[in-house]
Amino acid sequence: MAKTPYLTTPPKITTMPPGVPYIVGNEAAERFSYYGMNSILTIFMTKYLLDRMGHLSTMPPANAEAWYHTFVSTLYFLPIFGAVLADAVFGKFWVVFWISIVYCAGHAMLALIGTPIAHTIEPRYLLAIGLILIAIGAGGIKPCVSTNVGDQFGESNKHLLTRVFNWFYFSINAGSFISTLLIPWLLEPYQADPNGFIARLGPSVVGFLQSPRLHSADIAFGLPGVFMAIATLVFWLGRKKFVHIPPVGLKTYAREIFNKQTGKIILNVLMPVPFVMIFWALWQQNFSSWIIQAESMDRHLFGIEWLSSQIQTVNPIFILIMLPVFSYWLYPFLEKFVRLTPLRKIGAGLFVTAASFFIVAMIQTRIDAGARPSIIWQVWAFVVLTAGETLVSPTHLEFSYTQGPVKLKSLIMCTYLLAISLGNQFTAAVNFFIQNPDGSVKLQGASYFMFFVWVMLGTAVLFTIVSPFYKGRTYLQDQTRVTGDAEPGVGFAVQPEA
């Protein structure tokens, strides 16, 4: 057997694996690129999309939401192929590296929309091609990146796994926080407040910051591409620090999948998916319908008029607050009265998420009546939505990882991503269905949000009935199986993503 210059099993150490900083750095830059692009996609399609002649050719909100959620659904469906390539053919490292290059190409296609090339190629074609490439890139690496974190750990340092998953989650939210503030600002025209801080920086600085060239689609879509290139470089630099779990080969892989035991494991892990998918059908709308709603609200807060696509920045802020609060205070307190299994956390999160959409529906009722409510009400809805996310997303992710046999980690992780894909496809289907030929929609205003409230409540009730019947096992990278209770003692992990 040929020797490899890379580690193929976790080293027997009790400290942090040496490859972790590269993985976390890669994830922070990649999440900056994705969430930056993601934050402006809906608003770009509804406000700034042009045709080849340079005329405004925007999409109606329902159509833009359908496009957006179809893109996200495709992105989260493709990881199944990345998982097979990673586990059976090439290994996780090479799949992440090469598909990251496709990812960069997708960002480049979106950046071309703001260049003279858009006068020769229809911008909607560039948009579609770019989104397809990004879906392939982001989707292909998703089952590999978070499992690559787990692959770095063995029995001797497994106690650090949850801590690293928390840092991993922190890097996601740090990247998304910065990008969702900056990238929308680069897309929208900017005029400095004559009495503000920027106006006192000098004419040359103010002129640069107000330049139409700076605030353009090619810059707004191009900067995320630069960060994706940085993420790819950081990942390459860490290649000799990582544990490279060898691919098992297609024959072994097929044998592992197509047997009775693995079939039962996959079916068990799929149990939460139909319920969690509805959570994602609601959560992902903070990038679509919530942004469109914010356009009709008074966005003055703390002396600043925020852009509608910047309001979602509060989500990573609340996540960074709620993660330690839930993990170190709320959960230990509640454990004194009731056993908090992962599935119970998920069930509670489903009910909480329904409450967030009820708040948004009440906001929309005021807008429909002609009022212009303060954006602080949507911020409160984000507080509730983020609480639901904290309960559902990281718990389900780590749950999925620990339930996967050693040779099938990436494939089992796809069940988590499948829930996101199906949830977005559900929302896309709703938005396609409600469009009438005359341009009107069947679910208008508050009725649209209330529809999702009732769907989420029904899902949550059904989940509380079904979840007690779940039986499963916990697996780690250097163990064949850990026999335990029906549910593993998992804590916080990481959202890929949304």
Predicted regions and their residues:
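A gly/Pro-rich, aromatic-decorated transmembrane alpha-helix motif that marks the paired
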Residues: 39, 77-84, 111-112, 174-189, ...
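Helix-loop boundary and gating motifs at the non-cytosolic
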Residues: 14-73, 271, 280-293
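Conserved MFS/SLC helix-loop-helix module at the cytosolic interface between two early adjacent transmembrane helices
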Residues: 79-102, 108
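C-terminal transmembrane bundle
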Residues: 316, 328-478
